[in-house]
Swiss-Prot record:
Phosphoprotein keyword on record: yes
GO MF annotations, alphabetized: iron ion binding; phenylalanine 4-monooxygenase activity
Domain (ACT) ranges: 35-113
Organism expressing this protein natively: Bos taurus (Bovine)
Taxonomic path: Eukaryota, Metazoa, Chordata, Craniata, Vertebrata
The protein, known as: Phenylalanine-4-hydroxylase
Subunit (UniProt): Homodimer and homotetramer.
Pathway assigned in UniProt: Amino-acid degradation; L-phenylalanine degradation; acetoacetate and fumarate from L-phenylalanine: step 1/6
Reaction equation(s) it catalyzes: (6R)-L-erythro-5,6,7,8-tetrahydrobiopterin + L-phenylalanine + O2 = (4aS,6R)-4a-hydroxy-L-erythro-5,6,7,8-tetrahydrobiopterin + L-tyrosine
Record-stated family: Belongs to the biopterin-dependent aromatic amino acid hydroxylase family.
Required cofactor names: Fe(2+)
Matching CDD domains: ACT_PAH, eu_PheOH
Protein function: Catalyzes the hydroxylation of L-phenylalanine to L-tyrosine.
Length: 451
């Protein structure tokens, strides 16, 4: 299941004073805030005129930051958060900024108004803004959870949650000393699943798994450390792990994939039921997801889903999350004359990994228009699975689906700056074209040398 949930709710936030460690506290999230990004020519009094305009129209700024424009050397870009009460005057302000002052303006919003684009992170550091907005926390377990009546387990879960809440991008993921009981639970899951991988898992999973055993400590008697696994992932595909305390909203989780960041749980399931977990745990993340995120083609496919989610309307977020469910979580693929499992929900479930390749479920070809609206169950084995021709084929289908999402721009991930570039003007398109041209020249040169 990963750190993904298909339902948006009021989310809690972690309050932090100047980066110091704190515990999780329920608070008001700024879900309805409106953000403006505008650029101004670098000249005396330019920003003062805009601030005066805001004041005259009773616009209340709650945050402002600036940086030199990466597109135009003679301009500065300003990112501002506006109080929700300023919304009625916003349309007039944007009109004045564009026509009278000559600013380039982009409006971002987390509300559901039709004329605005939902907020999304533009830099990898901005993942800090929502990584703690989980739908459950630490010791808050449902009554049917195997660890609900175990105070020691609940306290342990809170320890893992606090690690995740205090984490910030760029920091090494803290090491965890797992207990002997936790190692025993891991060992049971590891041993049982590994016995099926050669016959049931896809080639990519089986190719990477021995490398994880060699370099990341994947053993029956050892629970790997997330930091070591994250470094291995980065060396393979640029993906990295980020600790999370529980389930994120679909929009936030998919947004992380756009930056090749996988929000990953660090706790382990309750020892009384080692072959069952009602939520994603470290067994699911490391045995199911990590091997595939180490594969270049699959990593790019996963990132395509994340990029498609940025700025998408809520109804398309639900569709993308459903596509994610039937591919990254419960996907099957053709390999030669056989069908193999690549979904993490299958590769981390002994029972369903056997079931999905039996004659019991229904198998359908991956057609995203149908997959995106297919209902599914979260309490029992899936009655049907979608079969991809290949990861590259699935990736192209996601790109085609993304083209149908109603948003007034396209996006591009810059791996050098770890930023999302919004492609909505000719200058940005020219910069991207120049970059692609340079890569094509390298390719052509290499081909010439092979002749």
């Amino acid at each position: 299941m990963s750190a993904l949930v298909l339902e948006s709710r009021a989310l809690g936030r972690k309050l932090s004073d100047f980066g110091q460690e704190t515990s999780y506290i329920e608070g008001n999230s700024d879900q309805n805030a409106v953000s403006l990004i505008f650029s101004l020519k670098e000249e005396v009094g330019a920003l003062a005129r805009v601030l005066r305009l805001f004041e005259e129209n009773d616009i209340n700024l709650t945050h402002i930051e600036s940086r030199p424009s990466r597109l135009r050397k003679d301009e500065y870009e300003f990112f501002t958060n506006l109080d929700q009460r300023s919304v009625p005057a916003l349309a007039n302000i944007i009109k004045i900024l564009r026509h009278d002052i000559g600013a380039t303006v982009h409006e971002l919003s987390r509300d559901k108004k039709k004329d605005t684009v939902p907020w999304f992170p533009r830099t990898i550091q901005e993942l800090d803004n929502f990584a703690n907005q989980v739908l459950s926390y630490g010791a808050e377990l449902d009554a049917d959870h195997p660890g609900f009546k175990d105070p020691v387990y609940r306290a342990r879960r809170k320890q893992f949650a606090d690690i995740a809440y205090n984490y910030r991008h760029g920091q090494p993921i803290p090491r965890v000393e797992y207990t002997e009981e936790e190692k025993k639970t891991w060992g049971t899951v590891f041993r049982t699943l590994k016995s099926l991988y050669k016959t049931h898992a896809c080639y990519e999973h089986n190719h990477i798994f021995p490398l994880l055993e060699k370099y990341c400590g994947f053993r029956e008697d050892n629970i790997p450390q997330l930091e070591e696994v994250s470094q291995f992932l980065q060396s393979c595909t640029g993906f990295r792990l980020r600790p999370v305390a529980g389930l994120l909203s679909s929009r936030d989780f998919l947004g992380g994939l756009a930056f090749r960041v996988f929000h990953c749980t660090q706790y382990i399931r309750h020892g009384s039921k080692p072959m069952y977990t009602p939520e994603p745990d470290i067994c699911h993340e490391l045995l199911g997801h990590v091997p595939l995120f180490s594969d270049r083609s699959f990593a790019q496919f996963s990132q395509e889903i994340g990029l498609a989610s940025l700025g998408a309307p809520d109804e398309y977020i639900e569709k993308l999350a459903t596509i994610y469910w039937f591919t990254v979580e419960f996907g099957l693929c053709k390999q030669g004359d056989s069908i193999k499992a690549y979904g993490a929900g299958l590769l981390s479930s002994f029972g369903e990994l056997q079931y999905c390749l039996s004659d019991k479920p229904k198998l359908l070809p991956l057609e995203l228009e149908k997959t995106a609206v297919q209902e599914y169950t979260i309490t029992e084995f899936q009655p049907l699975y979608y079969v991809a021709e290949s990861f590259n084929d699935a990736k192209e289908k996601v790109r085609n689906f993304a083209a149908t999402i109603p948003r007034p721009f396209s996006v591009h991930y810059d791996p050098y700056t770890q930023r999302i570039e919004v492609l909505d003007n000719t200058q940005q398109l020219k910069i991207l074209a120049d970059s692609i041209s340079s890569e094509v020249e390298i390719l052509c040169s290499a081909l010439q040398k092979l002749k």
